[in-house]
Design a protein with these regions (language model features):
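Pocket-flanking alpha-helical
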Residues: 8, 26-31, 129-163, 206-207
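Ligand/substrate-recognition segments at binding pockets and active sites
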Residues: 78-149, 220
Length: 250
């Protein structure tokens, strides 16, 4: 929440420290025994393509550096706390009470974030509907949320954080970011190379400002009988479509 309700979260160095103090590998291990992907950006791997057919996530990873580095996190946190005029800070992180993954995720976040001197982390769990309402109303300090792609393009995720997006629950504002997304969705929309460059720039701005903290990319394992044919799998929307599915006699 960057509305100013939480003193400290409007400081970029403090947010950067929280990102660096997030052990995504341990979170993936606790949530799915390592099945879920370790994010290198906001846009998950396998969703969108570059102009040359490569994975957009790999292109974006060259502009970001999401990594667990507690030593650097402590340094930035100390600098940020001094700039904010704080000696101690307590953060409440909200998750969904009817989700086992929320508990595992918040436990790991609490464990690593509290390595930052002067920081106390409290966990708060509410029902799913309440969590959605709290996010929409800005009634949170830090909140664990998720998103499923509506279409196979990076802007389905990156568009969440423009200043006028109804899904920008943290109320982070960046004119530079808005310009990058606006360019990707308007003047560069039909120019793949230019559009991808805009989207990579947006990923870089998100990372540099620590406007969001991606903790894991969800991977969904599926066990399919080899006799079942014709199932269509997509990286966006409903994911799997069975309209053409059939059982082979072979």
């Amino acid at each position: 929440n960057q509305t100013g309700k939480v003193k400290g979260l409007t400081n970029t160095k403090i947010r950067q420290a929280l990102n660096l103090a997030t052990d995504r590998k341990s979170i993936s291990q606790s949530v799915s025994e390592g099945l879920d992907g370790i994010p290198t950006g906001m846009t998950p791997a396998g969703l969108a393509k570059t102009a040359t057919g490569g994975d957009f996530a790999k292109a974006a990873a060259k502009a970001t550096a999401y990594a667990y580095n507690i030593k650097k996190a402590k340094k930035l946190f100390a600098e940020g706390m001094k700039e904010a005029g704080l000696k101690k800070m307590t953060l409440t992180v909200e998750g969904t009470s009817d989700s086992t993954t929320s508990k595992s995720t918040l436990d790991t976040i609490q464990q690593t974030w509290e390595q930052l001197p002067g920081l106390t982390v409290k966990e708060k769990f509410v029902p799913f509907k309440q969590r959605l309402q709290d996010a929409a109303n800005g009634n949170f300090q830090v909140i664990l949320t998720d998103w499923i792609a509506d279409y196979a393009e990076a802007t389905t995720f990156l568009g969440l954080f423009t200043s006028d997006s109804p899904n920008n629950d943290g109320k982070w504002v960046s004119k530079e970011y808005d310009q990058a997304i606006n360019a990707a969705e308007s003047k560069d929309a039909l120019n793949s190379k230019a559009r991808i460059a805009d989207e990579v720039r947006a990923e870089k701005i998100l990372y540099q400002n620590s406007a969001v903290n991606p903790v894991y990319w969800v991977n969904s394992p599926v066990l399919t009988n080899p006799k079942v044919k014709g199932i269509l799998n997509f990286s966006s929307g409903a994911g799997s479509y069975y309209m053409h599915a059939y059982i082979s006699k072979k």
